[in-house]
Amino acid sequence: MRSNYIVIEGLEGAGKTTARNVVVDTLKELGIEQMVFTREPGGTQLAEKLRSLVLDIKSVGDEVIDVKAEVLMFYAARVQLVETVIKPALAEGQWVIGDRHDLSTQAYQGGGRGIDQQMLATLRNAVLGDFRPNLTLYLDVTPEVGLKRARARGELDRIEQESLDFFNRTRARYLELAAQDDSIRTIDATQSLEGVTRSIRETITAWLQEQQA
């Protein structure tokens, strides 16, 4: 079976870490052992420094990060990760399991921040070309539920401290994009842990069967 790039997406508190564990267990049960794990922003020395700049509320003191500067930092981190980690791993036959990818930018910056979608499309095409995940699992949860979970984890980062309206716009854009792309599968993340686990397993199994058809 050829290598694939699977990405897990969702709002803060959607349960991405739990979902990743389910994905890994499911793939291992199917005999897939060679996996590389990534997160965005991050995953390389350069990308991790950019992550700190864009997410740590103390990284630039009182300076306000312009929304366009923010999106450019996300893309700088992304291209470094894709070119130095993800593509080489896929070429070696390893599966890549990612915590966030470009869909986050389309939802958070395009939906939440309201950045022009044509600008984002131009950036995406310039940086990524036709590179896309083979499968994206979007964990759908209301902002109220997600933020409650996130707050329970401890201190929030710069984006996690955004308004409820911001996250409502972000979620709406996620759902809009998921409805337009067959490679994005929506998982109801408000279910019980058992329900989410079952949904992810069923989704991956069905997707793999589609690939082999």
Curated annotation (Swiss-Prot):
PANTHER family: THYMIDYLATE KINASE, UMP-CMP KINASE 2, MITOCHONDRIAL. ATP binds at residues 10-17. PROSITE patterns: THYMIDYLATE_KINASE. This is Thymidylate kinase. Keywords: ATP-binding, Kinase, Nucleotide biosynthesis, Nucleotide-binding, Transferase. The keyword ATP-binding applies. The keyword Protein biosynthesis does not apply. One of its GO terms (cellular component) is cytosol. Gene3D superfamilies: P-loop containing nucleotide triphosphate hydrolases. Its EC number is 2.7.4.9. It is an enzyme of class 2 (transferase). The lineage of its organism: Bacteria, Pseudomonadati, Pseudomonadota, Gammaproteobacteria, Enterobacterales. It catalyses: dTMP + ATP = dTDP + ADP. GO terms for biological process: dTDP biosynthetic process; dTTP biosynthetic process; dUDP biosynthetic process. It holds the Pfam family Thymidylate_kin. Phosphorylation of dTMP to form dTDP in both de novo and salvage pathways of dTTP synthesis. One of its GO terms (molecular function) is ATP binding. Belongs to the thymidylate kinase family. Transmembrane segments: none annotated.
